[in-house]
Each structure stands twice: as structure tokens, then as C-alpha cells.
Amino acid sequence: MSPQEATALHVLAYVLLHNGQSEKAAVLLEALDALRPGDSRTLLALAAAHLRAGAAARALYALDRLTYDAAAPPTANLLRAQALSLLDRPDEARRAMHAFIAPKPPLSPG
């Protein structure tokens, strides 16, 4: 799959997600994940779609598949906090929210 095709599918999933079709967006993003496994942009969008569809456990599974490193997007922790909260895991949700709001080191010019 070309990068342009992947981008087109992401745009379609975004439109579906923001027009009340979160389940359809999740199906599309699951297919995209099968074609390009481990893509962080896809996994974040998939987690958001699952959260909107009320599937917190599936959202958390998508987030758990992300590779965390220094460049991991902060929104992953926000989505994780939301999923954990919905799963009635308040202590873990609090830690994820603290990680989301924690000060980040400035980017060095490179």
C-alpha cells in the first residue's frame, strides 16, 4: 500500500469518526492496521474510534501495541487515561493523565 493510499484511508476514517460512524471508522482502521501493522498514526486513530464506539478494552489494546519512545505522541497517554477510566481502573487512569500533562523537554534544534 502506498503512503498516498494509506493517507486516503486515514482521511476517510477521520470523516467517518467525526460524523457519528465510529464503528465503521474502527473497521476501516483495523483493516489499515492489518495492511500496515504497528503504524502509530493508525493505532492512535483506532484507539480513538474504539473509545467513541464505547469499546474501551479494544482502545486500550490498540494503545498497548504502540511502541513507546521519546517521540511517542502525548495523545496516547490521554487516550489511555480515557480508556482506563471507562474500564474503572482509576489509579492507572490517573497515572496516564499525569504522564499526559507532565512537562515535556524542549525539542533541541537538530
What are these regions (language model features)?
Residues E5-V27:
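Alpha-helical segment of the N-proximal tetratricopeptide repeat
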